[in-house]
From Swiss-Prot:
Database matches in InterPro entries: EF-Tu_GTP-bd, EF-Tu_GTPase, EFTu-like_2, EFTU_2, G_TR_CS, P-loop_NTPase, Small_GTP-bd, T_Tr_GTP-bd_dom
Listed name of the protein: Elongation factor Tu
Assembly and binders: Monomer.
EC number: 3.6.5.3
Localisation: Cytoplasm
Region (G2): 55-59
Binding site for GTP: 19-26, 76-80, 131-134
Length: 391
């Protein structure tokens, strides 16, 4: 099955397995690689190495495989805390997820939590694998569990009635027995993933955005801002907006430079300098973004989903309370903000993950799904994602 050479001709999609502990996420991951990739056994996936993302230690296993139609990068995490951190930091961005539910147990607390997190952090699509069906003798019971899963998904605003639910046994597939619930179920699952989870728009095809990292003035030519283009394309002559921190202004890009060479355009992934017409050195600063006019607005108030580091991870040693005022680091800059805790929450302990409201002292170019770090005096004490913009 293994391909000699990685062909970049197929569209690429990032997915992962989510769900309650011991429901079979890692076994399923192994079974998929057995049929569609270079086989990785359970042990090698389960002993995932630790990585650091935004100062947070996360264990994540990365595997890749391909179907007729697509190439997939797939993440699987050994522990529940790793999932929470992964989803919140966006360390492994997912275009869709395979929710694994044990048919004998039905949805459990972490099943719920992962669906809620998926909704908050913007995982747009889910496909369900109902695992361990050989442990349930009663056909009606399977139907009830499926209904329960669909209702749970609907309650978190996923289209529960439309989401594919594939019954099977990942272990049977891995051990090469009972093809009807084993191997065939994995084929059905990947066919559903192929069809139901759309290929995301490539970064280049999205509206232009570049966080400003530095500002220079070049005598006789004007002001140059530098940064890495996050998405889209900028052409010489394009009208662009400068958004965040101050009032939004418009300007025209009169030149694009990369490695000291003049180009006609810069695109997603490029580190460029953009020459701005009629903007003086004081008129623009790090922390603002250049973007396609009207594509992103500045905001100060939002609902966040956040993970607070433990003291072992270098975070706080003590809890924080209402009106906590740390810095929120968005893209390239820190902005002070006040935390408004949800009703009934008195304090937040290191190691907690929760939802709260934030009000910043200056507006930031913001959209749902934007990641940030929570810092105190330059030290990271948490990570979060904009779940919903309020104003």
């Amino acid at each position: 099955m293994a391909k000699e050479k990685f062909e970049r001709s197929k569209p690429h999609v990032n997915i992962g397995t989510i769900g309650h502990v011991d429901h079979g996420k890692t076994t399923l991951t192994a079974a998929i690689t057995k049929q569609f990739g270079d086989f990785q056994d359970y042990a090698s996936i389960d002993s995932a190495p630790e990585e650091r993302a935004r100062g947070i230690t996360i264990s994540t296993a990365h595997v890749e495989y391909e179907t007729e139609n697509r190439h997939y990068a797939h993440v699987d995490c050994p522990g529940h805390a790793d999932y929470v951190k992964n989803m919140i930091t966006g360390a492994a961005q997912m275009d869709g997820a395979i929710l694994v539910v044990n048919a004998a147990d039905g949805p459990m607390p972490q099943t719920r939590e992962h669906i809620l997190l998926g909704r908050q952090v913007g995982i747009p699509y889910m496909v369900v694998y109902m695992n361990k069906v050989d442990q349930v003798d009663d056909e009606e019971l399977l139907e009830l569990v499926e209904m329960e899963i669909r209702e749970l998904l609907s309650s978190y605003e996923y289209p529960g009635d439309d989401i594919p639910v594939i019954p099977g046994s990942a272990l049977a597939a891995l051990e090469g027995r009972d093809d009807a619930i084993g191997k065939d179920s994995i084929d059905k699952l990947m066919a559903a993933v192929d069809e139901y989870i759309p290929t995301p728009a490539r970064a280049v095809d999205q509206p232009f955005l570049m966080p400003i990292e530095d500002v220079f003035s070049i005598s006789g030519r004007g002001t140059v801002v530098t940064g890495r283009v996050e998405r889209g394309v900028i052409n010489v002559g394009d009208e662009i907006s400068i958004v965040g921190i101050r009032d939004t202004t418009k300007t025209t890009c009169t030149g694009v430079e990369m490695f000291r060479k003049l180009l006609d355009r810069g695109e997603a992934g490029d580190n460029i300098g953009a020459l701005l017409r009629g903007v003086d050195r004081e008129g623009v600063e790090r922390g603002q973004v250049l973007c396609k006019p009207g594509s992103v607005d500045p905001h100060t108030k939002f609902e966040a989903e956040a993970y607070i580091l433990t003291k072992e991870e270098g975070g706080r040693h003590t809890p924080f309370f209402a009106n906590y005022r740390p810095q929120f680091y968005f893209r390239t800059t820190d902005v002070t903000g006040t935390v408004n805790l949800p009703a009934g929450t008195e304090m937040v302990m290191p190691g907690d993950n929760l939802k709260f409201e934030v009000e910043l002292i200056a507006p930031i170019a913001m959209e749902d799904g934007l990641r940030f770090a929570i810092r105190e005096g330059g030290r990271t004490v948490g990570a979060g994602v904009v779940a919903k913009i309020i104003e």
